From Swiss-Prot:
It is found in: Virion; Host nucleus. Belongs to the herpesviridae major capsid protein family. Homomultimer. Makes the hexons and eleven out of twelve pentons. Interacts with triplex proteins 1/TRX1 and 2/TRX2; adjacent capsomers are linked together in groups of three by triplexes, heterotrimeric complexes composed of one molecule of TRX1 and two molecules of TRX2. Interacts with scaffold protein; this interaction allows efficient MCP transport to the host nucleus. Interacts with capsid vertex component 2/CVC2. Interacts with the small capsomere-interacting protein/SCP. Self-assembles to form an icosahedral capsid with a T=16 symmetry, about 200 nm in diameter, and consisting of 150 hexons and 12 pentons (total of 162 capsomers). Hexons form the edges and faces of the capsid and are each composed of six MCP molecules. In contrast, one penton is found at each of the 12 vertices. Eleven of the pentons are MCP pentamers, while the last vertex is occupied by the portal complex. The keyword Ribonucleoprotein does not apply. GO terms for cellular component: host cell nucleus; T=16 icosahedral viral capsid. The keyword Iron-sulfur does not apply. GO terms for molecular function: structural molecule activity. This is Major capsid protein. It comes from the Viruses. Keywords: Capsid protein, Host nucleus, T=16 icosahedral capsid protein, Virion.
Length: 1370
C-alpha cells in the first residue's frame, strides 16, 4: 500500500501545473495519506477525522475548479470560518457623493456621505453519497492474512475513493451552478435594464400613467427588437454593437481591484459574458476578428474575511455572537489594530496565476467570453441559461377589405384573374417551422364553428340579464321599445288610428345600430355596442309589464348582421363569390327587361287599373283567362304609349301572363320580357340554393331549406293570394288564435256565393281558393317580393287594400253592365266574335259610352284597355266579367313558425312572426282615381312607403308632417304596433337599409337573396364546403414554444461570495452509511445598480410545429349535443368528429380531472402540433389591427392607467366599452370577443367554461386573454414589475439606500411568457392567396416583414422575423 499514490486512484484535476501554489496538485495524495494515517485506528476516531479531512479536500478542489472558470471574474471570493452561524448579513457601505466645482456666483454643493445597505443571500449547496457497510468494515479492519485480503482491502479503497471523487466533482459543479443562479437572480433582461438607464430621470419624479405607459412601450419595443438576436442576423457590426450595449447597460462594481483580471497587455477585464457553448461558438465565429486568446492574471486563492478599518464592511449581524467579536470591535474603535501582521498582510495579498481565456473588446470594455458546457455535460441538471419561451401569435381568416382599399402595393409581381382578385378571402396561408406552406380555411374550422356551444346563447343571455339594463341617462332611449301582441282582426282598418295619435315611436336598438357606419361602429360613441354579444343572436332590452327585461332572439339569416359588421358592399362581394361558384349566367337581354321593370315600378304614371285587375284576379287562373284579352290589350297599349310593363307589380299576374298569353294574344317581344322576368326569378332561386345538394334530405326536410330562407316553407312572401301546400309547423292567425281547418273555407266562384260576399269584412273564417301553391311557386313568389321588388324600387312600394263593397258597386252598378243586349256573344275565353260589337252600335258616341260606364271607370280604362277595335264600353264589360271572382277585403295575417331543426338549438321555444297581406296588392304609386276606396297598409319594411301612405291617408300625412324624420324608405318609417316585431321577424333593419340605397340592377336582387342564407351549423357546413364566405371572419390564435439560449453579462467582481469549509455529516444504517456534504455560500451584491443583465440570444428549436391544426371543440366540450338526434349525427359526420359514447362514471371523471380523448396519429412527422383556437370576428375588423402586436380579444387588456389592485376599476377597464381601450382608442375591434358574456368570453373564459363542462386536459392559447382573474393577475404583476424596476432606476443619492438590485417579481414571466404579461399576441406572416405567399418566398428575407394589399387580398407581415431569418439562418 505504501507504493500506491492518489494520482493512480483519482483522475488528475484539469488545471495548469503552475496554478495555485498553496493549493497543491497533490490534494488527492494528501487525502489518501490522511486516510492511511487513520487506517486501522479506532473507528470512531477515524469517522470524525474522515469527515473533517473530506470537507477540507472538497473545499480545495471546488475552488480550484471555480477559480479557473471565466465566471469567477464576476465573483469576489472571501473565506469566513463562522459562516455557518451567519443567517442574514447586513452590510453598510460608505459612499461619498461626487461633486462638481462651480463658477463664481453659483452655490456650491456640500460634501455628502451616503450609507448604502446590502444584504447577504444564503444559498447552501449539498450532495449526499453512500458507502456500503462492507467497504467500511474492510477499511476499519487490520489485514494480516493472505493476498486475497489485501486485494479486497484495495477494492474497498477504490470504491470509497470513486464515491469521494464523484462527490467532490458534484461540489465543484454545484458551486458554479449556484453562483450562476445567483447572478441570474440579479440580472434583469437587457430591455429592462436599458430602459431604466434611459429613464433614470423619471425615477426622480412621481410616476404617472403616461410615464408608466412609455416605460412599457420601451420594454416591448426593445424586447421585440432583441429577441432571438443571433438568429435574426449575421451582420457582424450589428451583433458587436448590441453586445457593446449589453455590456454598457450594466453598472460597475464598487470592488474594482486593479491587480486582478488583467491581460498580458495590461488591459483591465470589465466583466464576463456567459452563455451556452452553441451561442459562444456562433459569436466567436461571427466576431473572430474581435476575439483574442489572452493570458489573464486571475486570483489563485480567496481572501480571508477580516474586520479592518480599510475595507468596506462596517457591521455584521449574527444570530449568535462570535466569541472574539468584542475583541475585534475593540481593535476597530481604538483605531490601533493589534491583529497579527502576518494575517493582515495575508488578507491583503492575493496570489495570482495566469489563465488562458477568450477576450473580446466591446467599446471601451474588455470582456471574458465563457461557456459552462463542462459543468452541465452528462449531468441531469439543466443549464439555467437554457430556457423555454412561449410566444402567442394571431392572424385573420376571411377579413373583408372595403372598397377604398381597391388598390395594390404588390406592383407587377402578382397577377390574379378577376375572379380571385375580387373574391372574398376565405383562406389564410402560413409557413410552418419547416417553411412548408400551410392552409387554413373555414372548412378546417368546422370542428369549432359547428359545436353546439357556439349556437347556444344561454350563457351570454345569463350574463346579459345579470348585468341589467344600462343606467346612464343617454342610454335610456335604448330601453323604451315595447313589442305588444295585438289581435290581427281588423288590423288593416286600425292602421290610421295608430298614426292619428301622432306619437313618436321609440326606435329599436337594431335600427340604431344601422346608423353607425363601419368606421363609427367600433367607437365609444356607439351606445348600442353592449348588445352586440353574439354573431348569431340579437340581444336587447325592452319593456314588458312596466319592467325592463332582456330579450334574445336568433338572427336567422346572414343579412340580419348589423350594417357596421357586414356592410352592403360586403354582401355584394359575397354574391359575386356565390355566382362564380354556381357558374350561372343570367338570361339573354336581361338588362333591357330589368330596365323596363325598373322604369315601370318607379314610374309615377303607372296605371291604377292594374291594381284593380290584380285585386279582382287575385291569382285565380280562371279569372285571368276570362279577361286575358283585356290584360293583353293593356300591356300592348302601355308599352307603346308609356314604355311600361304593366302588371309587373304583381308576381301572380307576371307568371299568369308568361304562361297563358303565349298563344299569340301578346306580341312575342312583349311576352319575352315577362318570361325573362320569370327566368330572372328562377336564376335567383338557383343562386340561393347551393350546388351539389341533389335534393338531399335531413330530418324530412330538403337541405336547401337549411341553407337559404327562400327555400324554407316557414318563410312566407309579403303578399299572398294562395296558401302553400306545405304548412307543416306553420300557424296562421287572422284574429286572435291560429286558424284550424274549420276556420278555413273554400271559395265557390260561379255559384251562389252570397255568404262569403256577406262576410267580406269578417276576420274569420279565412276564404281561400282550392289551388295551393307548390314549393317552387312559393319560392319564386318570395324571390319576387323579397328580392326583386325591393331592389328595383328601393323600398318605395307599399301595401294596399281596396274597399271592394263600395268600389264594385260604384264602378259596375250601372245598366250598361246589368242589361247587356242579346247580340252580345262572349266566349268563355274572353274573346268577342267578329259579328258582334258587344252592343255598341256605330252611332254610339264616345261621350255616350263614358256616360254609360261612369266617370271613374272611364278614367281607369280609357287609353289603357281600349284600342281602335275595342271601344270603352266593351273593355269595361270585359273587366266586369272578373267581378264574379272577386275576393274578400284585405287582411293582414300573422304567420307564426318555429325555425328549422338546426336553428332550434339555442332557443327551441322561439317562434318567428311574419305579417303578410292577403287579398291586397303591392302598389308603386299612390292611386288618385281610387283614392276614396284605397286603404294604405304599411305592414313590412320593404312595403311601407310614407309618400304613398301620406297621399292616401290624411292621418299619415299629418303624422309625417309633424315628424319629418320619418319620411324615409330605409325602414325608419314606424310600422303600426301589431306589425312592429323587429326581433321576431325573419328580415330585420339591415335588409331595408341595404335595399333602400342599392343600385337597381340584377346584382342587387341576387345580393338580397344571398343575404337570406341562414345562420345555422348545417348552413355553415354546406356554405364552407362550397367555398362560400359564411358572413363572419375568424381570428386564429396559436401559442408556440421555443427552446432558447440566454446570454448573461456580469461586471467584474459584481458579487462577493463568502464561503467556508464544507460540513460533512453522516447517517448510519445497517447496510450503508450516507454522508451529506453541505457547503454554506453567502453572496452580497457589490453594485449600486444592476451589474448584470441577460438577453434571449438564440433559439435552438421550435418545440411546436407552428401549424394550423384547429382546436376540436367537440373534445374540449365533449358533453354538448344538438337537440335533434339526426341533425346531431349529420353535423358530426360533416365536421369529421365522432359522437362520444360515455358512461356516467367516465363523464364525471372527464369533467373533474380532464381526459385526453384525442387519438394519436399513426405517424407524426411534424412533432408536437400547435393548437389554433378561433375567435369569431366581424369581417369589417381593420386588417391593420393584425399587423402590430395586439390583443386577440379586439380590446386592450393591459391597463397601466388603472390600479389593477382595484378589482372593480380593473374589471371596468377590461369590459366597459364606454371607455376607449388603451391601444387603439376605439371601444373595441371585435364586440363578439371583448365584452363580458360575449361568445368568445363564454368559450375561453374559465369562469364560463366550468358551467359548460369542459375537458381541462386541453391547452387553450386563448384562455390567457379571456380569463378575467388571469388578466388582472398579469396586470398586477406588470404594474408591480414596472414600479419596482423604476424604484431601482434611482441612484443611491436620491433613492432609497436600502434598495436591493435583484430581479423583481414578474421578470421570469416577462422573459418566458411575455405575451401573457403584456396581454398581446404577435403578428405572423399570413396571406390570403397562395400567389402572394409564393411572391414572399421569392422576394428574399426582407419581404417577410412587409404587409401588403392586393385589391381584396392582403399580406400580414411578421414583426419578429421568424420565417425571414430566425428559423433558417445558417
Amino acid at each position: 500500500m505504501e507504493n500506491w499514490s492518489a494520482l493512480e486512484l483519482l483522475p488528475k484535476v484539469g488545471i495548469p501545473t503552475d496554478f495555485l501554489t498553496h493549493v497543491k496538485t497533490s490534494a488527492g495524495e494528501e487525502m489518501f495519506e490522511a486516510l492511511r494515517i487513520y487506517y486501522g485506528d479506532d473507528p470512531e476516531r477515524y469517522n470524525i477525522h474522515f469527515e473533517a479531512i473530506f470537507g477540507t479536500f472538497c473545499n480545495r478542489l471546488e475552488w480550484v475548479y471555480f477559480l479557473t472558470s471565466g465566471l469567477a471574474a464576476a465573483a469576489h471570493a472571501i473565506k469566513f470560518h463562522d459562516l455557518n452561524k451567519l443567517t442574514t448579513g447586513k452590510m453598510l457601505f460608505h459612499v461619498q457623493v461626487p461633486r462638481v466645482a462651480s463658477g463664481a456666483g453659483l452655490p456650491t454643493s456640500r460634501q455628502t456621505t451616503i450609507m448604502v445597505t446590502k444584504y447577504s443571500e444564503k444559498s447552501p449547496i449539498t450532495i449526499p453519497f453512500e458507502l456500503s457497510a462492507a467497504c467500511l468494515t474492510y477499511l476499519r479492519e487490520t489485514f494480516e492474512g493472505t493476498i486475497l485480503d489485501k486485494i479486497l482491502n484495495v477494492e474497498a479503497m477504490h470504491t470509497v475513493l470513486r464515491a469521494l471523487k464523484n462527490t467532490a466533482d458534484a461540489m465543484e459543479r454545484g458551486l458554479i451552478h449556484s453562483f450562476l443562479q445567483t447572478l441570474l437572480r440579479k440580472a434583469p433582461p437587457y430591455f429592462v435594464v436599458q430602459t431604466l438607464v434611459e429613464n433614470a430621470t423619471l425615477a426622480r419624479q412621481a410616476l404617472n400613467r403616461i410615464q408608466r405607459s412609455n416605460i412599457l412601450q420601451s420594454f416591448k419595443a426593445k424586447m421585440l427588437a432583441t429577441l432571438f438576436l443571433l438568429n435574426r442576423t449575421r451582420d457582424r457590426d450589428y451583433v458587436l454593437k448590441f453586445l457593446t450595449r449589453l455590456a454598457e447597460a450594466a453598472t460597475d462594481s464598487i470592488l474594482d481591484n486593479p491587480t486582478t483580471y488583467t491581460t498580458s497587455s495590461g488591459a483591465k477585464i470589465s466583466g464576463v459574458m456567459v452563455s451556452t457553448a452553441n451561442v459562444m461558438q456562433i459569436i466567436m465565429s461571427l466576431l473572430s476578428s474581435h476575439i483574442t486568446k489572452e493570458t489573464v492574471s486571475a486570483p489563485a486563492t480567496y481572501g480571508n474575511f477580516v474586520l479592518s478599518p480599510e475595507n468596506a464592511v462596517t457591521a455584521i449581524s449574527y444570530h449568535s455572537i462570535l466569541a472574539d467579536f468584542n475583541s475585534y470591535k475593540a481593535h476597530l474603535t481604538s483605531g490601533q489594530p493589534h491583529l497579527p501582521n502576518d494575517s493582515l498582510s495575508q488578507a491583503g495579498a492575493h496570489s495570482l496565476t495566469p489563465l488562458s481565456m477568450d477576450v473580446i473588446r466591446l467599446g471601451e470594455k474588455t470582456v471574458i467570453m465563457e461557456n459552462l458546457r463542462r459543468v452541465y455535460k452528462n449531468t441531469d441538471t439543466k443549464d439555467p441559461l437554457e430556457r423555454n419561451v412561449d410566444l402567442t401569435f394571431f392572424f385573420p381568416v376571411g377579413l373583408y377589405l372595403p372598397e377604398d382599399r381597391g388598390y395594390t402595393t404588390v406592383e407587377s409581381k402578382v397577377k390574379l384573374n378577376d375572379t380571385v382578385r375580387n373574391a372574398l378571402p376565405t383562406t389564410a396561408y402560413l409557413l410552418n417551422r419547416d417553411r412548408a406552406v400551410q392552409k387554413i380555411d373555414f372548412v378546417d374550422a368546422l370542428k369549432t364553428l359547428c359545436h353546439p356551444v357556439l349556437h347556444e346563447p344561454a350563457p351570454c343571455l345569463q350574463t346579459f340579464t345579470e348585468r341589467g339594463p344600462p343606467s346612464e341617462p343617454a342610454m335610456q332611449r335604448l330601453l323604451e321599445c315595447r313589442f305588444q301582441q295585438e289581435p290581427m282582426g281588423g288590423a288593416a282598418r286600425r292602421i290610421p288610428h295608430f298614426y292619428r295619435v301622432r306619437r313618436e315611436v321609440p326606435r329599436t336598438v337594431n335600427e340604431m345600430k344601422q346608423d353607425f357606419v363601419v368606421t363609427d361602429f367600433y367607437k365609444v360613441g356607439n351606445i348600442t355596442l353592449y348588445t352586440e354579444l353574439h354573431p348569431f343572436f340579437d340581444f336587447t332590452h325592452c319593456q314588458e309589464n312596466s319592467e325592463t327585461v332582456a330579450l334574445c332572439t336568433p338572427r336567422i339569416v346572414i343579412g340580419n348582421l348589423p350594417d357596421g359588421l357586414a356592410p352592403g358592399p360586403f354582401h355584394e362581394l359575397r354574391t359575386w363569390e356565390i355566382m362564380e361558384h354556381m357558374r350561372l349566367r343570367p338570361p339573354p337581354d336581361y338588362e333591357e327587361t330589368l330596365r323596363l321593370f325598373k322604369t315601370t315600378v318607379t314610374s309615377p304614371n303607372y296605371p291604377e287599373l292594374c291594381y284593380l285587375v290584380d285585386v279582382l284576379v287575385h291569382g285565380n287562373v280562371d279569372a285571368f283567362l276570362l279577361i286575358r284579352t283585356f290584360v293583353a290589350r293593356c300591356i300592348v297599349n302601355m308599352f307603346h304609349t308609356r314604355q311600361l310593363l304593366v302588371f309587373a307589380h304583381s308576381y301572380a299576374l307576371v307568371t299568369l301572363i308568361a304562361e297563358h298569353l303565349a298563344d299569340g294574344a301578346l306580341p312575342p317581344q312583349l311576352l319575352f320580357h315577362y318570361r325573362n322576368l320569370v327566368a330572372v326569378l328562377r336564376l335567383v332561386t338557383r343562386i340561393s340554393a347551393l350546388p351539389g345538394l341533389n335534393n338531399g334530405q335531413l330530418a324530412e326536410e330538403p337541405l336547401s331549406a337549411y341553407v337559404n330562407a327562400l327555400h324554407d316553407h316557414r318563410l312566407w312572401p309579403p303578399f299572398v293570394t294562395h296558401l302553400p301546400r306545405n304548412m307543416e309547423g306553420v300557424q296562421v292567425v287572422a284574429d286572435r288564435q291560429p286558424l284550424n281547418p274549420a276556420n278555413i273555407e273554400a271559395r265557390h266562384h260561379g255559384v251562389s256565393d252570397v255568404p262569403r260576399l256577406g262576410a267580406m269584412d269578417a276576420d274569420e273564417p279565412l276564404f281561400v281558393d282550392d289551388y295551393r301553391a307548390t314549393d317552387d311557386e312559393w319560392t319564386l313568389q318570395k324571390v319576387f317580393y323579397l328580392c326583386l321588388m325591393p331592389a328595383m324600387t328601393n323600398n318605395r312600394a307599399c301595401g294596399l287594400g281596396l274597399n271592394l263593397k263600395t268600389l264594385l258597386v260604384d264602378l259596375f252598378y250601372r245598366p250598361a253592365f246589368l242589361l247587356m243586349p242579346a247580340a252580345t256573344a262572349v266566349s268563355t275565353s274572353g274573346t268577342t266574335s267578329k259579328e258582334s260589337t258587344s252592343g255598341v252600335t256605330p252611332e254610339d258616341s264616345i261621350a255616350a259610352q263614358r256616360q254609360a260606364v261612369g266617370e271613374m271607370l272611364t278614367e281607369l280604362v280609357e287609353d289603357v284597355a281600349t284600342d281602335a277595335h275595342t271601344p270603352l264600353l266593351q273593355a269595361c264589360r270585359e273587366l266586369f266579367l272578373a267581378v264574379q271572382f272577386v275576393g274578400e277585403h284585405v287582411k293582414v295575417l300573422e304567420v307564426r313558425a318555429p325555425l328549422d331543426h338546426a336553428q332550434r338549438q339555442g332557443l327551441p321555444d322561439f317562434i318567428s312572426r311574419q305579417h303578410v297581406l292577403y287579398n291586397g296588392c303591392c302598389v308603386v304609386t299612390a292611386p288618385k282615381t281610387l283614392i276614396e276606396y284605397s286603404l294604405p297598409v304599411p305592414f313590412h319594411r320593404f312595403y311601407s312607403n310614407p309618400t304613398i301612405c301620406a297621399a292616401l291617408s290624411d292621418d299619415i300625412k299629418r303624422y309625417v308632417t309633424e315628424f319629418p324624420h320619418y319620411h324615409r324608405h330605409d325602414g325608419g318609417f314606424p310600422l303600426p304596433t301589431a306589425f312592429a316585431h323587429e326581433y321576431h321577424n325573419w328580415l330585420r333593419s339591415p335588409f331595408s337599409r341595404y335595399s333602400a340605397t342599392c343600385p337597381n340592377v340584377l346584382h342587387s336582387v341576387m345580393t338580397l337573396a344571398a343575404m337570406l342564407y341562414k345562420i345555422s351549423p348545417v348552413s355553415l357546413v354546406l356554405q364552407t364546403k362550397a367555398h362560400i364566405h359564411p358572413g363572419f371572419a375568424l381570428t386564429a390564435v396559436r401559442t408556440d414554444t421555443f427552446e432558447v439560449d440566454m446570454l448573461l453579462y456580469s461586471g467584474k467582481s459584481c458579487t462577493s461570495v463568502i464561503i467556508n469549509n464544507p460540513i460533512v455529516t453522516k447517517e448510519e444504517r445497517d447496510i450503508s452509511t450516507t454522508y451529506h456534504v453541505t457547503q454554506n455560500i453567502n453572496t452580497v451584491d457589490m453594485g449600486l445598480g444592476y451589474t448584470s443583465n441577460t438577453c434571449v440570444a438564440y433559439v435552438n428549436r421550435v418545440r411546436t410545429d407552428m401549424g394550423v391544426r384547429v382546436q376540436d371543440l367537440f373534445r374540449v366540450f365533449p358533453m354538448n349535443v344538438y337537440r335533434h338526434d339526426e341533425v346531431d349525427r349529420w353535423i358530426r359526420h360533416a365536421a369529421g368528429v365522432e359522437r362520444p359514447q360515455l358512461l356516467d362514471t367516465e363523464t364525471i371523471s372527464m369533467l373533474t380531472f380532464g381526459s385526453m380523448s384525442e387519438r394519436n396519429a399513426a405517424a407524426t412527422v411534424h412533432g408536437q402540433k400547435a393548437a389554433c383556437e378561433l375567435i369569431l370576428t366581424p369581417v369589417t375588423m381593420d386588417v391593420n389591427y393584425f399587423k402590430i402586436p395586439n390583443n386577440p380579444r379586439g380590446r386592450a387588456s393591459c391597463m397601466l392607467a388603472v390600479d389593477p389592485y382595484d378589482t372593480e376599476a380593473a374589471t371596468k377597464a377590461i369590459y366597459d366599452h364606454r371607455e376607449a381601450d388603451a391601444q387603439t382608442f376605439a371601444a373595441t375591434h371585435n364586440p363578439w370577443a371583448s365584452q363580458a358574456g360575449c361568445l368568445s368570453d363564454v368559450l375561453y373564459n374559465t369562469r364560463h367554461r366550468e358551467r359548460l363542462g369542459y375537458n381541462s386536459k386541453f391547452y387553450s392559447p386563448c384562455a390567457q386573454y379571456f380569463n378575467t382573474e388571469e388578466i388582472i393577475a398579469a396586470n398586477k404583476t406588470l404594474f408591480k414589475t414596472i414600479d419596482e424596476y423604476l424604484l431601482r432606476a434611482k441612484d443611491c443619492i436620491r433613492g432609497d439606500t436600502d434598495t436591493q438590485y435583484v430581479c423583481v417579481e414578474g421578470t421570469e414571466q416577462l422573459i418566458e411568457n411575455p405575451c401573457r404579461l403584456t396581454q398581446e399576441a404577435l403578428p405572423i406572416l399570413s396571406t390570403t392567396t397562395l400567389a402572394l405567399m409564393e411572391t414572399k418566398l421569392k422576394g428574399g428575407a426582407g419581404a417577410f416583414a412587409t404587409s401588403e394589399t392586393h385589391f381584396g387580398n392582403y399580406v400580414v407581415g411578421e414583426i419578429i422575423p421568424l420565417q425571414q431569418s430566425m428559423l433558417f439562418n445558417s
